[in-house]
């Protein structure tokens, strides 16, 4: 890739901004025809004061046009860019949590069941793929966006709860500073640069070296990876085709381990250490 060439991500950002700008100008014109006193959108100056905007950077311009569309063209914004409300299921309770629990080191919790004199320990563990080394992230010919799937991360046994997902991306080489992005897209969204840059969810900028991106749910634990991602998909955009991306995927699970307490039918005494 030539250093003088406009990176695809920069080009896509400008195209997306111009699409929003044209929409704001069009709506402003329509509203002024209905109401001459309507204050329309202006890219270069504050229409209320007439003074030029102090900050004309791309990020500032995007923020201004986004705010205007949210306030004056809400239906368009909601249809094109707004995120859907994230379901907030009730906080899940592990078996035995009705009794008093005691916090232990390294996040372990022990639940005591008085009826059966058993304890349930919740043990945290990680699984990863690939296990020994990272693997190259492969793209289709003439494409620079790829969806990352996590169906190869499996729990040790059915019923284990999922806490989080960790995606490691090692970026090697490249002619430009802007290496790429990691973004979350809706399930039905096309895996393209335009959809990735227009995603209403936070996008993570990638830098040279090792990047670690964590994905967690609104709740403490969930039953599966699709539940954690809320049926959405994770995509990686490579901005510079002269760089190489290597990935490894991790998943953190919780597992319940039962144990019978050493309680007999004979005399029982307790010594309290102070």
Swiss-Prot record:
It is found in: Virion. Residues 102-113 have a biased composition (Basic and acidic residues). One of its GO terms (cellular component) is viral capsid. InterPro entries: RBDV_coat (IPR009516). Its main location: virion. Keywords: Capsid protein, Virion. Residues 88-113 are annotated as: Disordered. It holds the Pfam family RBDV_coat. Capsid protein self-assembles to form a capsid about 33 nm in diameter. The capsid encapsulates two genomic RNAs as well as a third, subgenomic RNA (RNA3) (Potential). This is Capsid protein. It comes from Raspberry bushy dwarf virus (isolate Malling Jewel raspberry/R15) (RBDV).
